[in-house]
């Protein structure tokens, strides 16, 4: 069993960010909430390297929301252009796009390159 101590309060068992943010703000009060967040951010995450390599669902959702909030994407969607087409013409947006959209755009570009090579021959 792992024992954690924060400001004189002993916490037993495994402490993760979800449990700490639910329990510590109540027990420590709002003034110490920032200290609790700093403490919980130093706890090592357990898991395989493959799990940590994939972006979380929240990160992907944030990327998608920021992408759809972009003025270029919004105006193009109003004109009936797909998000993938906008990303193909604006590589700066592609860098911050969710992984699924990046893969989709790469597949479209690869198929266009194959089609162009076929037309040349």
From Swiss-Prot:
Protein's job: Has a role in meiosis.
Any one biological process term the GO annotation gives: meiotic cell cycle
Organism: Schizosaccharomyces pombe (strain 972 / ATCC 24843) (Fission yeast)
Protein name: Meiotically up-regulated gene 143 protein
Lineage: Eukaryota, Fungi, Dikarya, Ascomycota, Taphrinomycotina
Compartment(s) of residence: Mitochondrion
Keyword Mitochondrion among record annotations: yes
Domain of life: Eukaryota
Keyword Mitochondrion: yes
GO cellular component, one term: mitochondrion
């Amino acid at each position: 069993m792992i024992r954690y101590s924060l400001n004189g309060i002993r916490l037993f068992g495994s402490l993760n960010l979800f449990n700490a943010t639910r329990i510590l703000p109540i027990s420590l009060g709002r003034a110490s909430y920032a200290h609790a967040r700093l403490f919980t951010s130093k706890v090592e995450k357990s898991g395989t390297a493959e799990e940590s390599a994939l972006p979380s669902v929240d990160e992907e959702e944030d990327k998608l929301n920021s992408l759809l909030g972009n003025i270029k994407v919004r105006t193009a969607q109003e004109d009936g252009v797909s998000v993938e087409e906008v990303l193909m013409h604006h590589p700066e947006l592609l860098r911050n796009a969710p992984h699924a959209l990046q893969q989709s755009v790469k597949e479209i570009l690869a198929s266009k390159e194959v089609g162009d090579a076929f037309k040349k021959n």
